Amino acid sequence: MPQTYTATAKFLHWLIAVFVFAQISLGLWMIGIPKAPPGIRVYWFNVHKSIGITLGLFILVRVVWRLTHRAPPLPATVPAWQRVAAKTSHVLLYVCMIVMPLSGYLGSSFTKYPIVYWGVRLPHWGWEAPALKELCSQVHLVTVTLFITLIAVHITAALKHLLVNRDGVFQRMWRRNLPAPGPTNS
């Protein structure tokens, strides 16, 4: 089994990471846009929806890839509790990556507003249901909050493996198969 992720897994990881960063940044920014004039707010919400749907498609590809390609093993030096923490956090990251775009899409489906995907109006299969829209919005908000927390933990753990442990874990997802630096002599 390779000691690094496949080129496809690395590409999907970093592509989705960039999209997620942009999407979360846009989402946090756009909630502060005044409701009047409505055209500006509608424009940015449609951009957010378009990025979300695109991201959802990339995530679907990533999930299928991950289910059909095993992750490389962690080094033997990684303690058992960290293995459990890594597996749990990865599962939760995937859950957030699925629930977040799905809850956003469903929430948009239960409003009177159309879903516009990069300028193309998608069929409106839902109906105006404020209670369902609010439920989906709350799920979306809770999920994004959990997702931001998990991303912070993920980045912190990756940097710990790169800068403190120096055990090659970070290099498994880097763009090239760099040799793992040896332990520090401190």
Question: Locations of the language-model features?
Answer:
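Membrane-embedded alpha-helical bundles that constitute the cytochrome b-like, heme-associated redox core
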Residues: 1-186
